[in-house]
Amino acid sequence: LDSFSDESRKILKTGEDLAPQTLDPDSDTLLILTPLKNSAKHLAKYFELIDKLKYPRHKISLAILVSDSTDNTLQQVVKAKKKYQERGPKEKRFGRFEIYRQDFFYTLPRNDRHLYKNQFDRRSLMARARNYLWTRALENEQWVLWIDGDLVEYAPSLVNDMIAFDKDVLVANCVVLKTYGTYKGKKIVYDLNSWQETPESMEMLKKLKEDDFLVEGDGTPFTTHRKHLNGFGKDDIIVPLDGVGGTFTLIKSHVHRSGVGFPAWLYEHQVETEGFAKLAKAHGFGVFGLPNHHVRHESE
């Protein structure tokens, strides 16, 4: 301490005095975050899957945002909270169960939501919803898990498995069971937002205008040449990524606490979860994916 100024020594002394009263993140608590819109029909399966998680229930907190719903999503979530936190057995109670309501007054027919012309407004609104949720719900948890409300299958041990990798940002591979067409009866990739840049995609990026907006998939004006999470092999246990989706994404809470959220504006030609991944990497955090750890989305 001899080399410190008097002011620096005072700062250090204050820190020592306050340390016992400062809350450090609990090393294994988990906050599940889910934004919902018109999701009443999915909620039974949503809670069924969470109930099957092998992670200790008392270490799990749950925060749900209900937005722009015209069905009884909110009423169903309130009913679920009473069931778990008041009427049900104590061993089934969550650490916290928070419900938020915020409308953004944006409507879009479900069948049109993947059209390129709608993507920027849609994804920007989703970014706003995610930011609204995590900035209000995150308290002292160490881990944040973003889960889509319309998943129908994932392994009970998946959270434990993902935490064991100890990565800043880690995403599972989201697939869907096709019920029609060429791939009927087969599981194919659903979430193309988890990807890795390639030499070809890096060349493509150099040719873009500043306000060009990139979206993965068919029907877009740009061929990105990126390698999607489903493009890796069986031996690729964990791979570095440059973009992520939000269907089942585990994040160390200090990533959010450092100020990394979901951009509702263009950041390196991306918004929302893909923009989040770009921001996280710019802040020095690691972003990874698990090609062979699957979650299954509701069929369309």
What kind of feature is each model-predicted range?
Residues 1-52:
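N-proximal low-complexity "stem/linker" segments adjacent to membrane-targeting elements
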Residues 34-36, 66, 147, 291:
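Short beta-strand/turn micro-motifs composed of small residues
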Residues 238-241, 246-257, 264-267, 274-296:
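Catalytic donor-sugar/metal-binding loop of nucleotide-sugar-dependent glycosyltransferases
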Residues 72-141:
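Active-site-proximal specificity loops/subdomain of glycosyltransferases
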Residues 29-30, 53-64, 85-89, 95-97:
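Short loop->beta transition adjacent to catalytic acidic/histidine clusters or analogous donor-positioning motifs
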Residues 134, 152-253, 257-263:
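Conserved catalytic core of nucleotide-sugar-dependent glycosyltransferases
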Residues 72, 127, 131, 135, ...:
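Acidic donor-binding/catalytic loop of UDP-sugar-dependent glycosyltransferases
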Residues 48-59, 69, 79-84:
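Short, acidic, metal-binding catalytic loop of nucleotide-sugar glycosyltransferases
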